[in-house]
From Swiss-Prot:
One of its GO terms (molecular function) is siderophore uptake transmembrane transporter activity. Residues 1-25 form the signal peptide. It is found in: Cell outer membrane. GO terms for cellular component: cell outer membrane. This is Iron-regulated outer membrane virulence protein. Residues 45-162 form the TBDR plug domain. InterPro entries: Plug_dom (IPR012910), Plug_dom_sf (IPR037066), TonB-dep_rcpt-like (IPR039426), TonB-dep_rcpt_b-brl (IPR000531), TonB_box_CS (IPR010916), TonB_rcpt_b-brl_sf (IPR036942), TonB_rcpt_CS (IPR010917). Residues 167-652 form the TBDR beta-barrel domain. It comes from Vibrio cholerae serotype O1 (strain ATCC 39315 / El Tor Inaba N16961). A motif (TonB C-terminal box) lies at residues 635-652.
């Protein structure tokens, strides 16, 4: 394999030239009125949204091949995909995946507590809807706990699914990936979306997917992965102002790693062995959207999800209720509501100090935000959220954010927002000793939530006809980080575990800091050629604890992405994409071992899309065009080499 690594300096020069080239841009025919809902809880133009927010549109998702949502997020500024192979996760602004809240149509989802030893990165994204069912993806960079509560420290990813239609329609996509290196596993996938009316007031929506990735014959590479999901929604229009929706879905992920193929063959505690993990998720939700005329608009849902790790005999049931009312009052747009969450964990295998196998907890919260139009061109959003939890008591999360439309082209926005992550169930249970090779981990009932304070300032430019650019600076203080320390003998009485490692327990002691800048550019070069790019600079440093002075995790300081799209004819579109990832510190075998610096790398992909008919489109692409090698010895993870993708989309 080859190595193609442009320096950060050359990339910065390229970016500067691209910005200067905007003076020669021609007007495009489309208008840019992108609407978002995640920043404030109601629809608004993206320039006016009180947050740093990016949108991946339906058109973006259809233009090329993405393995999953994680793959699509690689071009978003501020987003770092950590790890590699099929164990990737999503980090926003330097915060780990535990601090990224994932929503589907505004409903939170998480199954991480069925994987207490981080034995399943990449699983969370596998529960998301197939790409054919997604209308757009909204990504908020920075804390949003005022509206969304725990876990929204790094940011929020909201998957917005497609809406019902008044006539039957749908899409089917069939695709295959063939690896040039036959030691890497091929992949086949199919996903579909169909919707239509059952009566004047009742409509149905069904979507699903199946994916099979063959196991690599590369140690630490991709394991054998099978993914299946099916979701149905019934929408009932009570009257023009009120709608009810019932949703139910089932998902399954099976992952297998075998010694002699992708599984580790040496350096294990004891004998290295095959792994066979089976994860399941079932969910059901009922929701109501109402227009109460002069009072405002409401959005209410009740969701139950059951997540199971069958291989380790663990399951967690999450029940969430949330109701929000958005009310215009004079120059104010008021959003307020309540949210409740009940968690019930059953774990029959990992507690090594008592017979306890069940933990549960209930949280309640109230929140309020006000967008105040102080002037025609300036809006100030401020608000707060009060959470109450029987484990840690009460926690308040405030936010203040301003948006100033200087003129029709320029917008300045910025503010201060806060985030928190509540301790997980095992972390606060005193008679729970979580099995771990580095020392069994005792729960601590005195833990407080982890917190962050984010400050940011953005400058945005948009002509409304395709040309747009933005520059954002941010600074984040992360406090009360929960970490493991040696446990006093009067607390951890069980002594060393089966591997001879002394017990540990969790405390709030660590602090960290992240800061950086994010830049974006969309440039219509001609009526048929468009360039889009993003650049992210991130610095992170742990301020206390055993790893003071080190980055938080797998965090490259420099990320750069550029995509060139050419509408060659009415039926033919071609594209090329460059993704540069700067050097980064990688943990070798876990946080307790020495770190090493992984070198930078660049991937270049290219492909075409051709409309065979009005309803059938064929797509082809070459990924990792120059066969850049990313191996475990140098990077701590494995990525695919050159591979070929062929897909067929059928609309009806």
């Amino acid at each position: 394999m080859s190595r193609f690594n442009p320096s950060p300096v050359s990339l910065s020069v390229t970016l500067g030239l691209m910005f200067s080239a905007s003076a020669f841009a021609q007007d495009a025919t489309k208008t840019d009125e992108t609407m978002v809902v995640t920043a404030a809880g109601y629809a608004q133009v993206i320039q006016n949204a009180p947050a740093s927010i990016s949108v991946i549109s339906r058109e973006d998702l259809e233009s090329r091949y993405y393995r999953d949502v994680t793959d699509a997020l690689k071009s978003v500024p501020g987003v770092t995909v950590t790890g590699g192979g099929d164990t990737t996760d999503i980090s926003i602004r330097g915060m780990g995946s535990n601090y990224t809240l994932i929503l589907v149509d505004g409903k939170r989802q998480t199954s991480r507590q069925t994987r207490p030893n981080s034995d399943g990165p990449g699983i969370e994204q596998g529960w998301l809807p197939p790409l054919q069912a997604i209308e757009r993806i909204e990504v908020i960079r920075g804390p949003m706990s005022t509206l969304y509560g725990s876990d929204a420290i790094g940011g929020v990813i909201n998957i917005i699914t497609r809406k019902d239609q008044q006539q039957w329609s749908g899409n089917v996509q069939l695709s295959t990936v063939v690896q040039e290196n036959r030691a890497s596993g091929d992949e086949q996938s199919a996903n579909f979306f169909v919707t239509g009316p059952l009566s004047d007031a009742l409509s149905l929506q069904v979507y699903g997917q199946t994916t099979q990735r063959d196991e690599d014959e590369i140690e630490h590479g991709y394991g054998d992965k099978s993914l299946r999901s099916l979701t149905s929604k019934l929408n009932y229009q009570l009257n023009p102002d009120h709608q009810l929706q019932l949703e139910a879905g089932v998902s399954a992920q099976d992952r297998e790693n075998n010694v002699g193929k992708s599984a580790q063959s040496s350096g294990c505690r004891g004998t290295c062995s095959n792994t066979d993990n089976q994860y399941r998720r079932n969910h059901v939700a009922v929701s109501h959207q109402g227009d109460w005329q002069d009072v405002g608009q409401s959005d209410t849902y009740l969701q139950y999800e059951e997540n199971t790790n069958k291989s380790r005999e663990m399951s967690i049931d999450n029940t969430v209720f949330k109701s929000t009312l958005v009310a215009p009052i004079g120059e104010h747009m008021l959003s307020f509501g309540v949210e409740g969450k009940h968690e019930s964990l059953e774990d029959k295998t990992s507690n090594k100090i008592s017979s306890r196998t069940h933990i549960s907890n209930t949280q309640w919260a109230g929140f309020i935000e006000d967008e105040w139009a102080l002037a025609e061109q300036f809006r100030l959003t401020f608000g707060g959220r009060l959470d109450h939890d029987k484990n840690y008591g009460s926690h308040f999360s405030p936010r203040v954010y301003g948006v100033w439309n200087l003129d029709p082209l320029w917008t300045v926005k910025g503010g201060v927002s806060t985030g928190f992550r509540a301790p997980q169930l095992r972390e606060v249970t005193p008679d729970w000793g979580q099995v771990s090779g580095g020392g069994n981990i005792y729960g601590n009932p005195d833990l407080k939530p982890e917190t962050s304070i984010n400050k940011e300032l953005s400058l945005m430019y948009s002509t409304g006809s395709g040309l747009a650019a933005s520059l954002t600076a941010f600074h984040n203080d992360f406090k009360d980080k929960i970490t493991r320390v040696a446990c006093p003998a009067n607390i951890c009485t069980a002594g060393p575990n089966q591997w001879g490692a002394a017990p540990t327990y969790r405390v709030n002691i660590d602090e960290a800091e992240t800061y950086g800048a994010e830049a974006t550019l969309s440039l219509p070069i001609t009526e048929s050629v468009e360039l889009s790019s993003s650049y992210t600079y991130t610095h992170s440093e742990q301020k206390s604890g055993n790893f003071a002075g080190r980055p938080l995790l797998q965090l490259p300081k420099h990320l750069f992405n550029a995509n060139l799209s050419w509408q060659t004819t009415d039926r033919l579109n071609s594209w090329a994409n460059l993704n540069y990832r700067g050097k980064e510190m990688q943990p070798e075998g876990g946080a307790s071992n020495d770190d090493f610096i992984a070198p930078s790398y660049t991937f270049i992909d290219t492909g075409v899309t051709y409309a065979l008919t009005d309803t059938a489109t064929i797509k082809a692409a070459v990924y990792n065009l120059f066969d850049q090698e990313v191996n475990y010895a140098e990077y701590g993870y494995v990525e695919d080499g050159r591979r070929y993708w062929l897909g067929l989309d059928i609309a009806f």
